[in-house]
Amino acid sequence: MVNQKNLLVFILTIGVFGILNTEMGVIGLLPSIAEHFHVSASTVGWLVSSFALAVAVSGPIFPLLFSGINRKKVMLLVLGVFVLGNVVSIFTTNFTIALVARVVPALFHPVYCSLAFTVAAASVSQEEAPKAVSKVFIGVSAGMVIGVPIASLIAGAASLQMSMVFFAAVNIMVFIATLLFVPSMPVEERLSYGAQLSVLKKPATWLSIVTVILMNSAIFGVYSYFAEYLKTVTNMSSNTISLMLFIYGGANIIGNVVAGKLLINSAIKSVVSFPFVLGAVYIIMFFTGQLSVPMAIITLIWGILAGFGGNMNQYLMTSSTPEAPDFANGLFLTSANLGVTFGATVGGFFIAEMGTQYVIFVGLLSLVLSFVAILLRNYMFTLTRSLSR
């Protein structure tokens, strides 16, 4: 029984990796894709931005719509849509078709990811749920960070089409594994759409949404410009920058493992302490950003904190709305994407007005606001629980 549950969580982790790999893997391929389709750099950027926008829009809607359907069937549907999109991307010579082949699967992205978090949490006891979810988050981190260099390596060694084959192969393998090894998972207690939407009446839900947006803004507002920061402030070479990004990605995975333990044993203390610890890292980065060795150490610590932060955000959202886990995870994914967009926008403003070094300010500002949101969220969450007794 334990082995079957471990296999289920493993399949979910690889499934999330495949989906995030499809989303993020093209980042390193954009110049090659622009050349292949004979479009400008700004136009090819739509392959990334349109995907993120589709995820943000569908996050609160699609998981809700599919919440009453057998979860195995939903997983197979989503994986099938991604495989189809991957296959179209391999063979199309039309950029518009390639764009559609990404946007349509992107709409289903929150469905699979929210299901993966929900099913992983439900496969163990309530106390062990954060640990199971943290394992799925390893797939998120790997897809976001490791997928990019792997796809770039394949494209450089073989061709652009072969990197697309890599995306498809991962999703096909997960589809087959889901078909063969994941048991049927009918929804036993189906919640009405109204019952799930009613969680939006709770102040703690909205404060959790705000917290997730601000936390992701604090992390990705700086990380979005990390390569530029290392190039212009630290004066690193492109090869060294690639190494630093790998360090960050590996540290992210370590952060997921750490989160699984801390969120079980000391969730509230960890959440309240997080803005101070990350804030200290950013302050040190601001004053030592010109030095390569301190930046390498900072990158390692920052990556671990970022990995923990993703798990923490998901925990904050789902613990506020335990009665509607699928909808809560959809809200988490939307809030997280909005946080990335907000942080990157404000970070770009600081860079344009003050210089690359000052992108740290978007992180610090977001952390101050997120700390206030966390305190309010925890107060409302505690108040709501005491009144419901």
Segment roles from a protein language model:
Residues L8-A41, G59-F62, V222-A227:
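Extracytoplasmic
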Residues H38, N70, F91-I97, N235, ...:
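Helix-breaking motifs and short loop linkers at transmembrane-helix boundaries and internal kinks
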Residues V57-T93:
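Conserved MFS/SLC helix-loop-helix module at the cytosolic interface between two early adjacent transmembrane helices
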Residues G59-N70, G255-A267, I351:
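Helix-to-loop junctions at the C-terminal end of transmembrane segments
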Residues G85, T96-P105, V293-I301:
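Paired small-residue
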Residues I97, Q126-V182, Y225, Y229:
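Helix-loop-helix hairpin linking two adjacent transmembrane segments in secondary transporters
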Residues A101-G139:
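Cytoplasmic helix-loop-helix junction between adjacent transmembrane helices
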Residues K269-N313:
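C-terminal transmembrane helical hairpin of 12-TM major facilitator-type secondary transporters
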